[in-house]
């Protein structure tokens, strides 16, 4: 036995000897220690703040193999000065004042294994911060020279017995963590020691061996132990907050160099040092970076023989490895990480101890490495702080407030009363907010940030104590703002104690409704420690009865909580990066996720079902959005029955469910893709739902084959809205530049060739993805726009806009907003029904109903027997999300029906006058990152964006008569409002790079602040005369003695050193040094402005870094890189340098006391002009006389008389705006515009004018034009007639004609002969049209297109004369013109010509005759001609706007392009033998003398609550607006047109218009082709004189070739030549609201052949017959079996069992319960309760009388029928019983 022990001892001694080759027995090694940690904005200035450290380190090996150490003579020096050579600067000792560092000088021991330091043993009374500094020093000796912990890598090489050269990676423990470390070991030439003796000061002791260099580089990205604290980096992409690199704004690197002498078996560590550098872009936007550099250098001073054994430790404590140890807030004593881990996992205790014992006696390095790797996980797992308790402040490690006071929390300082300090800060902030300007000089927002930090240190009782004080002060009126400041700060704390207190405040009604909602929203956004206990308590709060009873609070609670759930439990990456997981462990726990699946989602599901059963639309919308916020795949189980028609909800709610699955697409793209693609694939689904599914599908990054299938299907899909969405999103995805979208971009590019060639407008379904990438800036902007226009309106019913940026690798959600509505028209209808005007018009119509003629709309509806097509009830939402703050506004028809009462209540409040005071402090963004530096000192980076919004004042408003009267909305005649208020907004972006020295509780800091302050006083009175269309706003100027800052912006870089416990703003601390650049490098400005023009004096002053950037630079970058290039050019000139800009109001130099703004608007239809002959362009003197009138109405009258002169049947519009400043002197400015335009008369005039009454200067831009109408139905006439347009323009300004500058111009626009020849000889549509014309069809699509093409004006000839222009302006214009020459070189030709005259410029513009894709521009001035040729116009929008047309003006062309209308407006044509619908569908038509409905306006309306369904006849008879157009064939080539309409403009009367062919075959402008009678009275008109009715509401006039055009304002116009008729829609009114030969005018051309019984036929003959008023009755009463109703949606399975994680179940008995139906007498009757139905064959049936609910055969009825046929089970339990029906019911199944 004893021999065995002896053998073991010998083996152990030999192992100890071989495992410590750097340390010789009985020898003491003395090293000098030098360390420094400095922080500064090194790329801005050489100013630094930091600390130097010096000491001696004594090391010697013990007999037991441990390395014993001791530190002596420790001292430190504080640095706050300029260092010309940066952090490396050498400072003489004479210039440094060192202080003794109270660092433990007691011995410590290092446990070695094969030369590696495994554990540190210190005296038990060692302080934690001391232990960490010791670790930082001894970490320099952590050298794995043999690759003991090497990571497997085929490229690695290891030392041999003879040579130490090697390259390999290890996982190494040092003070900064357990990180991957790259070793590069190689020999150095020995001669280097001669020139660099410091690298090996004891080189003489080298003995045998080499000079060896060891280079180590740490890879923090790959680490197993990351001592750190981080918060707010949830949106960081592909990175870890403690990694080597985070985005493009954070760099962390650590490099070590050691010099050894000797050989592998015995060597001496001569010197070693490590440089740890952290570089941060302070506010993520500047190009300059700040840094913290930490360096530790250990150099061998001497080697001494040791005469005695090292002394033993009196009270040893093994504190584990060298990794930084977290401190305890209440106790700064060092503690063992061993004990912590044993407590966490006691089962590993025995195995760990056995493993350590076994390791001491291993002999082979290779076998040791192998066995170590094969063993169980290491005992020293990453340390964690105990999970925060709800009632206690969390023990956040590394933060200055937690470790800054000698390693303890600053709360432990008896002189630091946290409650009192918080109260003091709140009071200071409150006092400063009262006087807004003080917030600048007092740095109020800095104080608020400090306040938030202190509140996070408070326990529950601390917060409760201060809250009671603040609340009582507010109640007693002592302090107005203290409560709101503290309330907001507690919400920002985001801790458990904050949550518990906020919960109590709500329960005790300290905060309620909107105030409570804002607090909850902030709390959820700022949560820092979402433990399971915290999340459950938050859920309890969100589901409390008291919360649920307050609608706003309930909504915010639910939405905020579900957002937080997603962040913590669903998005794993965000959860890891957002919260301090390296300090407290992961919050993404299994229990937490189970809680979401088993409690949260089921609760929301239950609430959704309850809301659906109660028809509570607002709650339904909120619950859908809340489920979408969570984004877990389990929400599919909730939505599945509604998607697939098993349960009944409105189609709008189904749409919203799809729209709210955005986060599901982000987190579970594979599952989401399957669901969205199935929804998209279902062509019987509603188009808007499919469009939203396409948008969500793109979010899920679809694979290339899926996009290709979708692209190919656009050539087949019948729903053009969906095709438009697919095409737009694929085409925009092809243009994405960001690398993040590379996969999507490639997939889209491969799918693009497969897309349909059809062009769609932006006003159709449109999904646009766009990004702007500025690589140098590290900035990307991503924009998503989605819109979907319904069939009833060009205005989108779905709109969505998202903007987020990737800033140096940080994704930041800036804005997400949008809205959805079930029906735009229903919204307008519901609002209109609330008005008194509606009641009056309805009454007026009721009185006229009895006078309707036989062809009235209602009578025709009776004969047609239309089947009513109802809409769903109105539903709508508007939502917005800024950062993490989400708000949803929901309304429906019932909400709007309460609008009059809501307005009445508000009117009552504002009539009495309302005081308002809103003060809100908020952190828009917060980030914090802390970890130990190489010196063992905690580094901290913080980024804060606090803002203050303050709005205070009083408002009083009065409407006469009241807007809400008798529960109806009325149009007031007068409105007056008085408001006196001040709006103040202050914001700060603040960034600190700091570190803490716990031994003297100092914090060293480099910072950068960017401040913005805006304060606007408002003292105004508004008086509006609605009836006269006049408004006046008076602004009173405050009489004050001191200057008032309105805008103030500063950028301030600085360095600082201060006490950790200081609670004053950094800028106000004594040792803060603002970094100011040299004055010569800055541009200073100081000027006054405004007094000359307004009598108000403003001063602007400040300074900024000199920038050298010119216009040419920006143009160059725009050409090369577009917007991103300009950004980069501007950004390159930005910096973190000190700058300032201020705008102030100077009352002492201002004479104005009141400013008055007046606006007058007037519009009228003028049959005959006051002056028959057109007046010439005004001279300046004539203009002056017309503007001399003081009264706006008089000025308007004079101007209208002028612009309307000589123009028949003109619509005159005029606006006059004046601005007066009254005081010691009166300043007055007048600006206005007027326009006169006629539909028939070619003359028109536009005028803009301005007058400065003080300087007696006036000016005007007047344009007179002559634009004749063109022919509309005959291509030959259009080609034979030369279309042309003339413009005459004059711009002038000055005192009088003698000194005023003047620019005159004339332009003539025409169609070139080349254009005409191209159309005739080369355009393929010309020959198609001519063939159709031979068949007497003149206006089918080909001819329509050609007729429009024939009138484009591709040639422009112009001349410009100018005089008395300012020479500087002339030089500028000449410079710009020369720039254009250079820009378009070599497509420029310059030649000399004979002079065109002085001050004259003339030339031509010729567009390419074929397709206008190129343009030639000729400019002649003086004696030179410049030709720009073949200038590209590939942009379709540009071509649309630039190439003029005499009929379709620019606005009309733009609208047509946006709507995808090839001919700019939708048209319907009844030609000789063929007709065309509004959807461009053509078919054969054969009319007879029987009147046939071409177009009848039959709007869809939702049923009004409480009313029974009415027939179409009843609805149209009561409708205040009706239109019907009938046509009959009276002869072989002759048709007659009958139009009946009523409108409020007709006073409810039905107006009958008849258009008959003229008996005279020779038609012309003076001899029109038709005879028109209105209500039996013949109309007289020609091409310049209009015949009108109802004050211009109906207008009739002739076109140049005699065609007759009839216009109905804001509805349609009709062109008729006796043989054919073309109806053109001019607004949204007719969309999806017509029946007749023109089709349905919906976005679905496949339903154009809908007959009055509301089914679709394929037989065009029967389609035409069904709309014959008399003959069609028999066919309408017995529709063909081939006539099929359009029923959408048809449901299908979109969620598979795997997607939804659920299985469908059936009844065990073989039966299922289903609703049934029967069809009788045009009704469909549904069973109110489901009946048993056999899955297999029926064995026995019984006959029963079953209660049923019957519905007329409407779309709704067929929808339910289709739903049941597909296996759905709609809920009829709440429907009334119509009758009973006998049915056979299954009693038993086989």
Curated annotation (Swiss-Prot):
Keywords: Disulfide bond, Glycoprotein, Secreted, Signal, Storage protein. Residues 342-400 are annotated as: Disordered. Glycans are attached at residues 219, 297, 554, 573, 893, 1345, 1416, 1430, 1480, 1699, 1735. Residues 342-353 have a biased composition (Acidic residues). The keyword Transcription regulation does not apply. It is found in: Secreted. Precursor of the egg-yolk proteins that are sources of nutrients during embryonic development. This is Vitellogenin. The lineage of its organism: Eukaryota, Metazoa, Ecdysozoa, Arthropoda, Hexapoda.
């Amino acid at each position: 036995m004893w021999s065995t022990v002896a053998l073991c001892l010998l083996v152990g001694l030999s192992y100890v000897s071989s495992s410590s080759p750097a340390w010789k027995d009985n020898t003491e090694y003395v090293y000098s220690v030098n360390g420094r940690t400095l922080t500064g904005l090194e790329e801005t200035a050489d100013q630094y703040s930091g600390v130097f450290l010096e000491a001696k380190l004594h090391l010697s090996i013990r007999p037991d193999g441990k390395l014993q150490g001791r530190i002596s003579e420790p001292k430190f020096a504080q640095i706050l000065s300029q260092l010309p050579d940066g952090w490396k600067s050498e400072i003489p000792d004479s210039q440094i004042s060192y202080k003794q560092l109270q660092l433990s000088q007691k011995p410590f021991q290092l446990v070695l294994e094969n030369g590696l330091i495994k554990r540190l043993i210190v005296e038990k009374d060692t302080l934690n911060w001391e232990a960490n500094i010791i670790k930082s020093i001894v970490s320099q000796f952590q050298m794995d020279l043999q690759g003991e912990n090497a990571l497997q890598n085929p490229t690695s090489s290891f030392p041999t017995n003879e040579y130490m050269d090697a390259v390999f990676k290890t996982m190494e423990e040092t003070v900064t963590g357990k990180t991957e470390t790259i070793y590069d070991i190689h020999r150095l030439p020995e001669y280097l020691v001669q020139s660099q003796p410091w690298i090996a000061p004891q080189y003489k002791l080298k003995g045998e061996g080499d000079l060896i260099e060891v280079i180590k580089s740490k890879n923090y990205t790959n680490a197993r132990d990351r001592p750190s604290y981080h918060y707010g980096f949830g949106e960081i992409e592909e990175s870890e907050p403690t990694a080597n690199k985070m985005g493009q704004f954070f760099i962390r690197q650590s490099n070590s160099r050691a010099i050894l002498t000797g050989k592998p078996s015995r060597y001496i560590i001569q010197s070693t040092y490590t440089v740890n550098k952290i570089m941060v872009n302070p506010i993520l936007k500047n190009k300059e970076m700040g840094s913290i550099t930490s360096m530790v250098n250990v150099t061998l001073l001497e080697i001494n023989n040791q005469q005695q054994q090292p002394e033993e430790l009196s009270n040893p404590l093994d504190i584990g490895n060298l990794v930084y140890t977290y401190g305890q807030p209440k106790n700064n004593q060092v503690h063992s990480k061993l004990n912590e881990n044993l407590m966490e996992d006691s089962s590993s205790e025995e195995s760990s101890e056995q493993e350590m014992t076994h390791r001491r006696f291993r002999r082979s390095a290779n076998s040791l490495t192998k066995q170590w790797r094969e063993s169980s996980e290491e005992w020293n797992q990453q340390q964690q702080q105990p999970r925060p308790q709800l009632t206690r402040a969390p023990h956040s490690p590394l933060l200055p407030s937690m470790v800054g006071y000698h390693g303890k929390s600053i709360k432990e300082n008896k002189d630091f009363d946290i409650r009192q300090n918080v109260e003091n800060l709140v009071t200071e902030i409150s006092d400063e907010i009262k006087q807004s300007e003080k917030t600048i000089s007092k740095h109020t927002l800095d104080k608020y940030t400090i306040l938030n930090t202190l509140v996070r240190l408070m326990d529950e009782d601390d917060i409760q104590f201060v809250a009671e004080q603040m609340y009582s002060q507010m109640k007693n009126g002592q302090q107005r703002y203290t409560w709101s400041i503290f309330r907001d700060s507690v919400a920002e704390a985001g801790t458990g104690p904050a949550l518990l207190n906020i919960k109590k405040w709500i329960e005790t009604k300290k905060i309620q409704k909107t105030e409570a909602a804002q607090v909850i929203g902030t709390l959820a956004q700022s949560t820092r420690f979402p433990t399971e206990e915290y999340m459950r308590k938050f859920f309890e709060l969100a589901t409390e009865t008291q919360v649920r009873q307050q609608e706003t609070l309930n909504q915010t609670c639910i939405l905020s909580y579900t957002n937080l759930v997603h962040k913590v439990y669903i998005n794993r990456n965000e959860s890891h990066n957002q919260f301090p997981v390296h300090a407290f462990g992961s919050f993404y726990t299994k229990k937490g996720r189970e809680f979401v699946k088993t409690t949260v989602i089921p609760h929301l599901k239950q609430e959704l079902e309850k809301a659906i059963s109660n028809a509570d639309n607002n709650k339904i919308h909120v619950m859908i959005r809340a489920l979408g916020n969570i984004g877990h795949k389990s929400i599919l189980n909730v939505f599945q029955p509604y998607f697939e028609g098993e349960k009944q909800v409105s189609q709008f709610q189904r749409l919203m469910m799809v729209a709210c699955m955005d986060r599901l697409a982000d987190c579970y793209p594979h599952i989401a893709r399957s669901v969205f693609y199935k929804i998209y694939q279902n062509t019987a689904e509603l188009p808007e739902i499919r469009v939203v599914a396409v948008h969500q599908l793109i979010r899920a990054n679809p694979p290339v084959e899926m996009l290709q299938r979708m692209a190919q299907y656009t050539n087949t899909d019948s729903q053009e809205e969906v095709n438009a969405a697919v095409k737009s999103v694929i085409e925009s995805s092809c243009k994405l530049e960001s690398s993040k979208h590379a996969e999507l971009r490639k997939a889209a590019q491969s799918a693009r060739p497969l897309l349909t060639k059809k062009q769609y407008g932006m006003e159709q379904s449109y999904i646009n993805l766009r990004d702007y990438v500025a690589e140098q800036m590290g900035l990307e902007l991503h924009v998503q726009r989605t819109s979907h226009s319904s069939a009833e309106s060009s205005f989108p019913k779905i709109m969505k806009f998202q903007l987020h940026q990737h800033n140096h690798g940080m994704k930041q959600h800036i804005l997400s907003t949008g809205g959805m509505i079930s029906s735009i028209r229903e919204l307008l209808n519901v609002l209109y029904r609330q008005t008194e005007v509606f009641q009056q018009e309805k009454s007026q119509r009721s009185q006229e109903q009895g006078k309707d003629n036989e062809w009235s709309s209602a009578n025709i509806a009776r004969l047609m027997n239309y089947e009513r097509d109802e809409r769903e009830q109105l539903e709508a939402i508007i939502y917005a999300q800024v950062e993490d703050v989400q708000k949803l506004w929901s309304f429906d028809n019932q909400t709007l029906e309460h609008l009059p009462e809501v307005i009445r209540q508000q009117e009552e409040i504002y009539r009495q006058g309302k005081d308002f005071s809103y003060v809100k402090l908020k952190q828009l963004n917060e980030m914090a990152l802390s970890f130990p530096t190489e010196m063992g000192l905690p580094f901290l980076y913080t980024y804060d964006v606090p803002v203050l919004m303050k709005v205070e004042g009083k408002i009083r408003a009065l409407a006469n008569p009241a807007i809400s009267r008798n529960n109806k909305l009325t149009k007031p005649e007068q409105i007056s409002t008085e408001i006196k208020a001040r709006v103040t907004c202050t914001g700060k972006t603040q960034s600190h790079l700091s570190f803490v020295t716990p031994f003297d509780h100092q914090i060293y800091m480099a910072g950068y602040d960017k401040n913005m302050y805006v304060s606007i006083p408002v003292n105004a009175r508004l008086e509006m005369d609605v009836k006269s269309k006049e408004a006046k706003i008076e602004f009173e100027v405050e009489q004050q003695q001191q200057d008032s800052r309105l805008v103030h912006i500063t950028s301030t870089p600085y360095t600082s050193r201060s006490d950790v416990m200081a609670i004053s703003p950094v800028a106000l601390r004594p040792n803060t040094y603002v970094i100011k650049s040299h004055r010569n490098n800055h541009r200073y400005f100081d000027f006054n402005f405004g007094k000359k023009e307004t009598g108000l004096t403003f001063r602007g002053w400040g300074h900024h870094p000199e920038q050298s950037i010119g216009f040419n630079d920006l143009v160059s970058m725009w050409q090369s890189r577009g917007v991103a290039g300009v950004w980069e050019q501007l950004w390159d000139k930005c910096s973190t340098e000190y700058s300032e800009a201020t705008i102030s109001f100077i009352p002492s130099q201002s004479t104005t006391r009141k400013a008055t703004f007046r606006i007058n608007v007037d519009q009228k239809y003028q049959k005959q002009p006051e002056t028959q002959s057109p007046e010439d362009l005004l001279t300046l003197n004539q203009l002056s006389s017309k503007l001399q009138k003081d009264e706006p109405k008089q000025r308007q009258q004079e101007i209208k008389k002028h612009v309307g002169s000589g123009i028949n049947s003109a619509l005159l519009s005029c606006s006059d705006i004046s601005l007066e400043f009254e005081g010691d002197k009166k300043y007055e400015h007048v600006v206005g515009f007027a326009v006169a335009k006629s539909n028939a008369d070619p003359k028109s005039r536009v005028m803009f004018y301005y007058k400065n009454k003080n300087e007696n200067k006036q000016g005007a831009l007047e344009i007179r034009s002559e634009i004749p109408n063109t022919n509309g139905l005959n291509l030959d006439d259009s080609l034979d007639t030369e279309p042309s347009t003339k413009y005459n323009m004059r711009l002038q300004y000055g005192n009088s004609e003698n000194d005023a500058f003047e620019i005159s111009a004339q332009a003539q626009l025409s169609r070139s002969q080349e254009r005409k020849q191209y159309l005739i000889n080369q355009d393929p549509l010309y020959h198609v049209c001519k063939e159709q014309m031979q068949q007497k069809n003149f206006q089918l699509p080909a001819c329509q297109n050609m007729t429009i093409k024939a009138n484009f004006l591709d040639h422009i000839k112009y001349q410009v004369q100018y005089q008395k222009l300012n020479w500087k302006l002339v030089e500028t214009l000449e410079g710009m013109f020369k720039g254009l020459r250079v820009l378009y070189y070599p497509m420029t030709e310059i030649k000399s010509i004979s002079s065109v005259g002085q001050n004259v410029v003339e030339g031509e513009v010729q567009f390419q005759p074929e397709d206008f894709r190129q343009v030639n521009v000729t400019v002649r001035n003086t004696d030179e001609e410049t030709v720009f040729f073949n200038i590209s116009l590939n942009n379709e929008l540009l071509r649309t706007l630039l190439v003029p047309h005499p009929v379709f003006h620019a606005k009309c062309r733009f609208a047509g392009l946006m709507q995808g209308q090839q001919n700019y407006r939708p048209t319907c044509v009844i030609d000789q033998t063929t007709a065309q619908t509004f959807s461009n569908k053509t078919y054969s038509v054969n009319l007879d003398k029987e009147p046939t409905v071409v177009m009848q306006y039959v709007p869809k309306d939702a049923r009004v609550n409480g009313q029974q369904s009415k027939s179409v006849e009843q609805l149209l008879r009561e409708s205040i607006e009706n239109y019907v157009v009938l046509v009959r064939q009276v002869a072989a080539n002759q048709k007659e047109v009958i139009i009946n309409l009523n409108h409020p403009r007709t006073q409810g009367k039905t107006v009958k218009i008849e258009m008959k062919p003229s008996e005279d075959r020779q038609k012309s402008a003076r001899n029109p082709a038709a005879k028109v009678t209105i209500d039996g009275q013949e109309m007289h008109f020609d091409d310049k004189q209009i015949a009108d009715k109802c004050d211009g509401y109906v207008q009739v006039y002739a076109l140049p070739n005699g065609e007759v055009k009839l216009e109905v304002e804001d509805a349609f116009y009709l062109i008729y030549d006796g043989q054919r008729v073309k109806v053109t829609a001019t607004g949204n009114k007719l969309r999806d609201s017509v029946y007749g030969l023109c089709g349905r005018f919906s976005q679905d051309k496949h339903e154009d052949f809908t007959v009055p019984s509301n089914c679709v036929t394929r037989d065009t003959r029967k389609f035409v017959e069904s709309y014959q008023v008399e003959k069609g009755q028999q066919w309408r009463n017995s529709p063909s079996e081939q006539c099929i109703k359009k029923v959408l949606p048809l449901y299908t399975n979109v969620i598979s069992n795997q997607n939804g994680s659920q299985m469908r179940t059936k009844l065990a008995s073989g039966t299922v319960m289903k609703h049934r139906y029967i069809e009788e007498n045009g009704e469909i009757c549904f069973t109110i309760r489901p009946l048993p139905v056999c899955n297999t064959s029926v064995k026995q049936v019984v006959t029963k009388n079953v209660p049923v609910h019957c519905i007329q055969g409407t779309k709704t009825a067929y929808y339910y029928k289709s739903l049941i046929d597909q296996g759905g089970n709609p809920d009829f339990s709440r429907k009334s019983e119509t009758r009973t029906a006998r049915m056979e019911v299954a009693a038993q199944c086989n």
